[in-house]
From Swiss-Prot:
Zinc finger (RING-type): 138-180
Entry protein name: RING-H2 finger protein ATL63
UniProt-listed SUPFAM superfamilies: RING/U-box
Transmembrane segments: 29-49
Amino acid sequence: MSEEDGGSMSVKSSLSSFLKILSSYNSNVLLAALVFLLLVVLFVLLLHFYARFFWSPSHQDFSAAARHRRRRRRNRRRTVTTTRIIPSLPLGGFDDGVSSPAATATRDDKGLDSSVISSIPLFVYEENEEEEDEEEECVICLGLWEAGDFGRKLRNCGHGFHVECIDMWLSSHSTCPLCRSPVLAAVSDEENLKLAVNAVEEEAEVRLQMSPAGENESNVSGDRRVSLSLSVMEDDLKTGDDDGEEEVRIEVFDDDEEINDGGTRSDRRRSMSMTSSASSSLMRMLSSSSSRSERNKVFPTARQDSSK
């Protein structure tokens, strides 16, 4: 019996020691499994929040709009830099000491006067049924042309733009925004020097039908001839001042004779001064009236010789 009891005790002790070893091993494995599970749950939560805030459609639309705004701002800066710095080059390349009028206008671009801009002819856009597939757009505002839109067509190059767009452009530029050709015909320095040194005189002759107040046209005794003489003054050239306007002297010669104190007769003569812009308007009015009178064959204009 003693041997059997000793054998059973040894078996129990070995089993208890094995169970202790196994329990200690299971606790370490369980702890490692719990730590790994917590890491997996934390990673899944982070992935969920990332997908919710960065992959949502609203955030994608906001990001696309922000990228579009940055792209437009970058393209706008690039366009302005190209317009202001890079001049248009002649087709033949650079010539020694010679620059094209378009390049000169680009470097010294100060815009045009409002009266010059308003003189550019207008047109009304009409859609062409044969070219419906090709949509035309204004290169300044990048807007499509629609039927009934008003535009201006430049004389030299023939390009057309919206009235509001080209008026704003020409207020600070003097060239075409598409081909960079000058809007106004370039005048050489030699011609400018001749205009500044020599007094330019232009004469226009008109006839005025004068009748006293209260009388009929049948009682008109005759015609009255008035001769206008326009001359550009040289005061700006002598003094060195340049205010952008030339003074023009207008002398009016009247055929009606007046008697002086000595009993002699002399023609009436009056003179006045005005700016060159006002005188040019007066000359255009006189030329239009003279052309109408020539068409009607009534008192054709005649240019008097200054020597007489």
